């Protein structure tokens, strides 16, 4: 942007020292890191680790760390807020089990203490989620001869426990949904 180049103006044909060159390239890399942060965060929220990994593909470590600190200071990057939003999205929209959500949060680089705090403060009832899933997504599959077995297997692969699945089927059979 124009402010950056106005700040770092050099006359045509002017020779610069190695130190000036290094300082200029450092400023350019920092600006590149900041611009990349804004670009990535404008698309979706990221954890600090996710953003750091993406920045390190194109920017050096020093400027990556500086840019991340700036995003944290501005409030654009907050792992706790990101974790709460992720839990809400994965549990409500994607209908995932608590254990699968925990695994996904680890994968995205959220600190273990933030994961446990977020999952404690958020009430996720796997049985309610399962009842909803079974009645919407799996209802037709239950009509098949081995439907119960296939649905149970599918739900277990999604991270739900056999106990929770059985409880959900019992609630459906008893009309408690």
Identify the function of each model-found stretch.
Residues 1-177:
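An alpha-helical, amphipathic repeat domain used for nucleic-acid recognition
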């Amino acid at each position: 942007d124009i402010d950056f180049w106005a700040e770092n103006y050099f006359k045509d044909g002017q020779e610069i020292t190695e130190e000036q060159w290094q300082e200029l390239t450092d400023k350019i890399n920092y600006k590149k890191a900041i611009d990349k942060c804004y670009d990535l965060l404008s698309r979706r929220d990221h954890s600090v680790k996710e953003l750091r990994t993406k920045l390190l593909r194109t920017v050096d470590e020093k400027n990556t760390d500086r840019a991340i600190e700036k995003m944290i200071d501005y409030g654009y990057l907050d792992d706790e807020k990101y974790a709460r939003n992720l839990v809400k999205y994965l549990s409500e929209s994607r209908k995932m089990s608590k254990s699968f959500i925990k695994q996904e949060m680890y994968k995205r680089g959220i600190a273990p203490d933030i994961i446990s705090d977020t999952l404690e403060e958020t009430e996720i009832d796997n049985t309610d989620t399962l009842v909803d899933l079974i009645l919407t997504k799996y209802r037709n599959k239950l009509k098949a001869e081995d439907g119960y077995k296939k649905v149970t297997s599918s739900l277990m692969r999604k991270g739900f426990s056999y106990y929770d699945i059985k409880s959900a089927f019992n609630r459906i059979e008893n009309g408690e949904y």
